[in-house]
Amino acid sequence: WKPHNYQIELNNKLSNLNSALVIAPTGGGKTLAGFIPPIADIIKEAPKGLHTLYISPLKALANDIERNLESPIKEMELDITLETRTGDTKQSKRTSQKLNPPNFLMTTPESFILMLSWETSKKFFSNLKFLIIDEIHTLFNDKRGDLLSLGISELRNINSHFKKIGLSATVSDPKTILFWLNSGDNLNHNSTIIQQPKFLNPNIDIPKTKRNIPWSGHSGIYALNDILNIISQNKTTIIFVNTRAQSEILFQEIWKINEENFTIALHHGSLSKEQRLRVESEMSKGHLKAVIATSSLDLGIDWNSVDHIINLGAPKGVNRLIQRIGRSGHSYNRVSRASLIPTNKFELLECHAAVNLVNKEHLDKIDYSDGALEVLAQFLVGLSLSAPLDPDLTYRIVK
């Protein structure tokens, strides 16, 4: 393995900066880039307690990052502890983490906000050196992002010394995301954007089907044989759908015609923790032929065996489509391959438009809006649990 130029650039520049936004295509190694500065720092100083907080929009991604970091840390014989804390974490583990935090903690925005509500939150975060926000482009402009932004502002109130690293896929306006990353800091002058050149364009097709595409409906049942044919021709395929109900129906219908007994699994947020973790583990080992998934597997998962993506239904935005396509060929300079299968004739038009926009590298416009008031109310309730509210200080945190 050899580090890419932009990964080295981040490590060299961040020592003199307060924050950095890394823009890189899917599979470009941006998550590893984000961890290089913390690892280099912890080798020099060997601190105790929480050193680096990594925030991911998905539980599956947080789990995947922990697995991917364990191996190199062991190989380099580094004395670094790393753990994951999400809604799936056992209560005994959560208690242990609260009393004896690991050096690297992988978590989600919701779990991070809950940690800030502890009476011991100031002590817990007092020595934090790095905050990494992965897939920041999916968080910065929705209610989860509003809550996360408030949490980061409170974290800056607790500890003014940590550095922030934002990791993002290619977007149309990186400066807007950098502004969000630095909101509340007044440190924009001491930050940078590091951009990795884009890869080869993905290979996307809309398969011709022998059956007529229906005028209405969203099941995609007419294309079952086409889907199974694509699965048979590839090592591992992820079939993305837009709803959990759609994933359940498709899974059952595929099994009815799965005469070759391909190992096909299902993954969505309503499944039990044990079921989801088992699917993720089997995928990481390359044991599954296909997985039918919702947005629960949209982001960042590093499964090298995946060589094809099927998006069933119209893509909900160009950026999201590129993100999903990037699950295939998820490594440096491999071409991602995908098939778009519309569920009705109107979606056929949307699919053709989406392919055209991807080929022209026309990304979705980024809109930046004011935060939601209900999110502010939720944040204030959590903040009041950690300590009595000081009106002036609370105003500065929120502002």
Language-model region placement:
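Helicase motor core with emphasis on the C-terminal RecA-like subdomain
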Residues: 2-113, 117-386, 391-399
